UniProtKB/Swiss-Prot annotation:
Its EC number is 4.2.1.17, 5.1.2.3, 5.3.3.8, 1.1.1.35. PANTHER family: TRIFUNCTIONAL ENZYME SUBUNIT ALPHA, TRIFUNCTIONAL ENZYME SUBUNIT ALPHA, MITOCHONDRIAL. This is Fatty acid oxidation complex subunit alpha. It catalyses: a (3S)-3-hydroxyacyl-CoA + NAD(+) = a 3-oxoacyl-CoA + NADH + H(+); a (3S)-3-hydroxyacyl-CoA = a (2E)-enoyl-CoA + H2O; a 4-saturated-(3S)-3-hydroxyacyl-CoA = a (3E)-enoyl-CoA + H2O; (3S)-3-hydroxybutanoyl-CoA = (3R)-3-hydroxybutanoyl-CoA. The active site is at residue 451. Pathway: Lipid metabolism; fatty acid beta-oxidation. GO terms for cellular component: fatty acid beta-oxidation multienzyme complex. The record marks 119, 139 as: Important for catalytic activity. GO terms for molecular function: 3-hydroxybutyryl-CoA epimerase activity; delta(3)-delta(2)-enoyl-CoA isomerase activity; enoyl-CoA hydratase activity; long-chain-3-hydroxyacyl-CoA dehydrogenase activity; NAD+ binding. GO terms for biological process: fatty acid beta-oxidation. Residues 311-723 are annotated as: 3-hydroxyacyl-CoA dehydrogenase.
Length: 723
């Protein structure tokens, strides 16, 4: 043994050939701070080892290295710039040390080799993979960019254009593509991977492969003419500006980094990379996006605990109510390996549900995600039925009939008679209280809400609603089932609108009040989309949701929270509803809609809206962007905080993920609680109090006032990281 540490070891495997084996005691290898320090010492030991002829990098896991340890990021990024810069210099000196070994090096690349793992193997001379290899640099998805030499080495290995595509998109390449672009030097069968890599290294030692020329290319300036460079970088900047937009600076910064470093040799190019990395690491966007990643891991952890705690795993399910929603739920369950009965009283609805499932599976087939055999198997595991036959075998039943409390209660009561005492019943409802529906059941402890978002196959969030009598076992089983379906389940306590709809309607309330006071809805949409970062402005969102749906939900919320959400008079939603302008579904709402060539609705402004809104809106007047943002966001933020204060949602992490996954809250802002930390709670309180005359929706919750006085934050502990 040449060197041994907790997460890696170095030994001589044959005459003069040493192997650096990454072997962390956990389920995956990560380039955490401790592993980097060990790698540094291992390379020193190798440099001092006599008779060294070549070095192999291997892993004892199915994945080579999944990346850096993201749990350490926020702690690192919180350090002063100078300290972060020094740490990056140290980290890069390790990869330079690997690249500068006086002997050829080869990496045995299997499974996920991402982020820091990819940057590590880029420092070797040769890279051999197998069919499991997935290699790339996903850092821009976290608001940062490669900082261990990825922006320097990747363009020199595969060319600037391919490198910018991978880095700006945060892309991972499968083995075939990686081989084609030169990121891998060979792809072999898994059982021959180690032997092939050893043979490749032997060929390099015997100078059958010119490893020195390869290394020279990586440590020199990029070989691009002025014209090539201008065309390449100008085109990349144009594409990135179009796709990433102004709220996500990391992809553009990566292009600029590669461009600035192109004319320099490795060490100077690394200095440029480091300077830009530090700037991104200190940004609010990086803090928010890394925070979302950590929150997502937190939610996955809760789901894993629930699955372990549940006494029974869901093997079979049933959906009551077919159509688009029921078909979507059945498809998602079957796709993830849980066979499902789809029951309805109307054959036409069953046909619609099966058509929806077939349509979604055909899309998977077209994209090459599944083959025809797999598609047939998934479709066969959805059983459409007009009767309850076989439903007694279901472990979980999802009721997804029409949004009417009497109909839902009758269906739930009826199905309860058909199933065993262990069967869990759930209701897919967006507005009806779970405690109300539970009254129709003999076993309310086996019942909870399971609120899917539309379209089911695309929306990651499922709200799991705990009723007054719901047992922990029921919650654990439903959370585990939602996670098995590939969803992000978040448990909330029962109240009108649950969490997501409860916090959405004060936002719509702020919108209605702005219109009442003479604001232009097209300006509000532009500001909330372009400046704040929502995927849709409120008027457009209402049209997509459906004015009739929003009108009904608004009445439910007003009844549930009369002080804040009760209406003083008619508003814009009432005016459109009464004029039968329901939005996209009937071609006319705030905007008018026509179908484009692809069959997608395209919006346009029409003057016919003006007389409809006139009775509920003051004469048009100008509002600046900041006022619009404040008046729109304060009611939502207040309601989110009240939900935490009242225990409707358990944590800031879960609330922020629900907002991003369920409402499309701008990810670069990280959710309401991350946003409050970013702007400063005391600053928010002072700003919100300037609008207090607008009514109860603008009253700041006591929790925020107390936290502002104490100088507290919501993410203080997470911000410290694990260092």
């Amino acid at each position: 043994m040449i060197y041994q540490a907790e997460t890696l070891q170095v030994k001589e495997v044959q005459d003069g050939v040493a192997e650096i084996l990454f072997c962390a005691p956990n389920s995956v290898n990560k380039l955490d701070l401790a592993t980097l320090a060990s790698l540094d010492k291992a390379l020193d030991a190798l440099t001092a080892h006599s008779g060294l002829k070549g070095v192999m990098l291997t892993s004892d896991k199915e994945a080579f290295i999944v990346g850096a340890d993201i749990t350490e990021f926020l702690g690192l990024f919180a350090k002063p710039e100078e300290e972060l810069d020094q740490w990056l210099q140290f980290a890069n000196s390790i990869f330079n040390k690997l690249e500068d070994l006086p002997v050829p090096t080869v990496a045995v690349v299997k499974g996920h080799t991402l982020g820091g793992g990819c940057e590590c193997v880029l420092a070797t001379d040769l890279r051999i993979g197998d069919k499991t290899t997935s290699i790339g640099l996903p850092e821009t998805k976290l608001g940062i960019m490669p900082g261990f030499g990825g922006c320097v080495r990747l363009p020199r290995v595969i060319g600037a254009d391919s490198a910018m595509e991978i880095i700006t998109q945060g892309k991972a390449c499968r083995a075939e593509e990686a081989l084609k672009i030169g990121l891998l030097d060979a792809v072999v069968d898994s059982d021959r991977l180690y032997a092939s890599a050893l043979q490749t290294l032997t060929d390099a030692i015997n100078e059958k492969i010119d490893w020195k020329a390869r290394r020279q290319q990586k440590t020199s300036a990029l070989t691009l003419s002025k014209l090539e460079a201008m065309m390449s970088f100008t085109m990349a900047k144009g594409l990135v500006a179009q796709v990433a937009g102004p709220h996500y600076p990391a992809p553009m910064t990566a292009v600029v980094t590669i461009e600035e470093g192109a004319r320099f040799a490795r060490n100077q190019a690394l200095d440029i990379e480091r300077k830009h990395f530090v700037k991104l690491a200190k940004s609010e966007e990086a803090k928010a996006l890394v925070g979302l990643f950590l929150n997502d891991q937190y939610i996955k952890g809760i789901a894993k605990k629930a699955a372990k705690s549940a006494n029974k795993e869901t093997q079979r399910a049933a959906v009551l109510g077919a159509g688009i929603m029921g078909g979507g739920i059945a498809y998602q369950s079957a796709l993830k390996g849980v066979p499902v009965i789809m029951k309805d009283i109307a054959q036409a609805s069953l046909d619609l549900g099966m058509t929806e499932a077939s349509k979604l599976l055909n899309k998977q087939l077209e994209r090459g995600k599944i083959d025809g055999f797999k598609m047939a198997g998934i479709l066969a595991s959805i059983t459409p039925s007009l009767h309850y036959a076989g439903i007694d075998n279901a472990d979980i039943i999802v009721e997804a009939v029409v949004e009417n409390p009497k109909v839902k209660a009758a269906v739930l009561s009826e199905v309860e008679e058909q199933v065993s005492e262990e069967t869990v019943l759930t209701s897919n409802t967006s507005t009806i209280p779970i405690n109300l529906l539970a009254k129709s059941l003999k076993r309310p402890e086996n019942f909870c809400g399971m609120h899917f978002f539309n379209p089911v196959h695309r929306m990651p969030l499922v709200e799991i609603i705990r009723g007054e009598h719901t047992s922990d076992e029921t919650i654990n089983r439903v959370v585990a089932y939602a996670a098995k379906m590939g969803k992000s389940p978040i448990v909330v306590n029962d109240c009108p609108g649950f969490f997501v709809n409860r916090v959405l309607f004060p936002y719509f309330g702020g919108f209605s009040m702005l219109l009442r006071d003479g604001a232009d809805f097209t300006q509000i949409d532009k500001v909330m989309e372009r400046k704040f970062g929502w995927p849709m402005g409120p008027a457009y969102l209402l049209d997509v949701v459906g004015i009739d749906t929003a009108h009904h939900a608004q009445a439910v919320m007003a009844q549930g929270f009369p002080e804040r959400m009760g209406k003083q008079g008619r508003d814009a939603i009432d005016a459109l509803f009464e004029a039968n302008k329901y939005g996209q579904k009937n071609g006319s709402g705030f905007y008018t809609y026509t179908m484009d060539k692809k069959g997608k609705p395209k919006k346009a402004f029409s003057d016919e809206i003006v007389p409809i809104l006139a009775p509920v809106c003051a004469a048009q007047q100008a509002f600046d962007d900041q006022t619009i943002i404040q008046r729109m966001m304060i009611p939502m933020i207040n309601e989110v905080v009240l939900c935490l204060q009242e225990g409707i949602i358990a944590s800031a992490q879960e609330a922020d993920m629900a907002l991003v996954y369920g409402l499309g809250f701008p990810p670069f802002r990280g959710g309401v609680f991350r946003y409050l930390d970013s702007v400063g709670i005391a600053n928010f309180v002072a700003m919100a109090q300037q609008h207090v005359e607008l009514g109860a929706m603008y009253q700041v919750p006591q929790m925020l006032i107390d936290m502002a006085e104490k100088g507290q934050t919501f993410y203080g502990a997470q911000q410290q990281g694990s260092i």
